[in-house]
């Protein structure tokens, strides 16, 4: 007796090795309930090559015939010899281990997400009141959700995890996993701040996506909203706060008023000093030791000009030094306050 694997069934074949590929017929046992027995007919005299390889066991889904299940058999003789098997309905088999591979992966992912949701709700019970349900089909206008045959994730009203539960009424054909569009996979990957889009619709979807992660920092960013206009509003609010602060403090200036300038300085008409006798006259255009210059405008002082002498004995044009003292009460050369210098001398 030789065991031949046909799909998920192990069928015994009586006879020699050379006759194990002979066609046979089977019929379902009339009294079969949980176990399924099959009657094998007598072997036929048809001969096959002795090196005929056995079919490897493969997993098949309900609804497929036995001659279609092992898709990688190495000879066409077995396909011709086997008669089509009747469709078997395994309605008494339940549990996630018998589901298709893609559905089983979704079941495991659902378990992980539910555990993370439970831990987050236990540690932060007040967050459930701040969350609003979101419809995934409104997140991105260009995404066609009809292309996916997998169960669509639904956003929980009291949590932040995707609900990957499977409806019982769906047929097995709807569980085929198809590749997700590339622009949607970008948002399912690890979020990076410099990859966030700037348009409002994409930004809203990113905000909803990062809520799936249990990190408190990402949840805080999701609550903040990541609104593109938030940066401009923050700048506008900061500027308005500065204006309000200026109104409360008034005009803060470090300069002196005109009365203080007139009180602590000495304005007069400039009179140029003459050179002493016995010293040779210098050529016209050359500066002498007696020439004085205003260090603010860098112009030479001429006779009859209005000048102002500070308590530190530095001399400037009146117009130049008045504008300076209106902004700062310190001398432009020695940086001494005009009021402090006067008090020290007196």
Curated annotation (Swiss-Prot):
CDD domains: RING-H2_RNF165. Residues 275-284 have a biased composition (Basic and acidic residues). A zinc finger (RING-type) spans 294-335. Binds free ubiquitin non-covalently via its RING-type zinc finger. Ubiquitin-binding leads to enhance the E3 ubiquitin-protein ligase activity by stabilizing the ubiquitin-conjugating enzyme E2 (donor ubiquitin) in the 'closed' conformation and activating ubiquitin transfer. Residues 23-76, 267-288 are annotated as: Disordered. GO terms for molecular function: ubiquitin protein ligase activity; zinc ion binding. It is an enzyme of class 2 (transferase). GO terms for biological process: forelimb morphogenesis; innervation; motor neuron axon guidance; muscle structure development; positive regulation of BMP signaling pathway; protein catabolic process; protein polyubiquitination. Disulfide bonds: none annotated. Zn(2+) binds at residues 294, 297, 317, 320. Gene3D superfamilies: Zinc/RING finger domain, C3HC4 (zinc finger). InterPro entries: MBR1/2-like (IPR045191), Znf_RING (IPR001841), Znf_RING-CH (IPR011016), Znf_RING/FYVE/PHD (IPR013083). It catalyses: S-ubiquitinyl-[E2 ubiquitin-conjugating enzyme]-L-cysteine + [acceptor protein]-L-lysine = [E2 ubiquitin-conjugating enzyme]-L-cysteine + N(6)-ubiquitinyl-[acceptor protein]-L-lysine. It is found in: Nucleus. Pfam families: zf-RING_2 (PF13639). Keywords: Metal-binding, Nucleus, Transferase, Ubl conjugation pathway, Zinc, Zinc-finger. Its main location: nucleus. Its EC number is 2.3.2.27. Belongs to the Arkadia family. E3 ubiquitin-protein ligase that acts as a regulator of motor axon elongation. Required for efficient motor axon extension in the dorsal forelimb by enhancing the transcriptional responses of the SMAD1/SMAD5/SMAD8 effectors, which are activated downstream of BMP. Acts by mediating ubiquitination and degradation of SMAD inhibitors such as SMAD6, SMAD7, SKI and SNON isoform of SKIL. The RING-type zinc finger mediates the E3 ubiquitin-protein ligase activity and binds directly to free ubiquitin. Non-covalent ubiquitin-binding stabilizes the ubiquitin-conjugating enzyme E2 (donor ubiquitin) in the 'closed' conformation and stimulates ubiquitin transfer. This is E3 ubiquitin-protein ligase ARK2C. It comes from Homo sapiens (Human). The gene is ARK2C.
């Amino acid at each position: 007796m030789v065991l031949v694997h046909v799909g998920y069934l192990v069928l015994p074949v009586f006879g020699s090795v050379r006759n194990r590929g002979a066609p046979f017929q089977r019929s379902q046992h009339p009294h079969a309930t949980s176990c399924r027995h099959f009657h094998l007919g007598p072997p036929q005299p048809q001969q096959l090559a002795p090196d005929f390889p056995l079919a490897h066991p493969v997993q098949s889904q309900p609804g497929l015939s036995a001659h279609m299940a092992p898709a990688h058999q190495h000879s066409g003789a077995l396909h011709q010899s086997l008669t089509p098997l009747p469709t078997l309905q395994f309605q008494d088999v339940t549990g996630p281990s018998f589901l298709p591979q893609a559905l089983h992966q979704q079941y495991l992912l659902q378990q992980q997400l539910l555990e993370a949701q439970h831990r987050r709700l236990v540690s932060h019970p007040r967050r459930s009141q701040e969350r609003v349900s979101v419809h995934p089909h409104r997140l991105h206008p260009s995404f066609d959700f009809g292309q996916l045959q997998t169960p669509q994730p639904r956003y929980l009203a009291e949590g932040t995890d995707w609900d990957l539960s499977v409806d019982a009424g769906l047929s097995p054909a709807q569980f085929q996993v198809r590749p997700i569009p590339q622009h949607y996979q970008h948002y399912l990957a690890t979020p990076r701040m410099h990859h966030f889009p700037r348009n409002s619709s994409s930004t809203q979807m990113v905000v909803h996506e990062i809520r799936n992660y249990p990190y408190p920092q990402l949840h805080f960013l999701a609550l903040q909203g990541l609104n593109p206009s938030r940066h401009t509003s923050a700048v506008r609010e900061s500027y308005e706060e500065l204006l309000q602060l200026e109104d409360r403090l008034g005009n803060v200036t470090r300069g002196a008023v005109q009365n203080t300038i007139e009180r602590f300085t000495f304005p007069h008409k400039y009179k140029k000093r003459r050179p002493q006798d016995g010293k040779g006259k210098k050529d016209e255009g050359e500066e002498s030791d007696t020439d004085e210059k205003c260090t603010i405008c860098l112009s030479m002082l001429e006779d009859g000009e209005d000048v102002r002498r500070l308590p530190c004995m530095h001399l400037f044009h009146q117009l130049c030094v008045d504008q300076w003292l209106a902004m700062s009460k310190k001398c432009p050369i020695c940086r001494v306050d005009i009021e402090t210098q006067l008090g020290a001398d007196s």
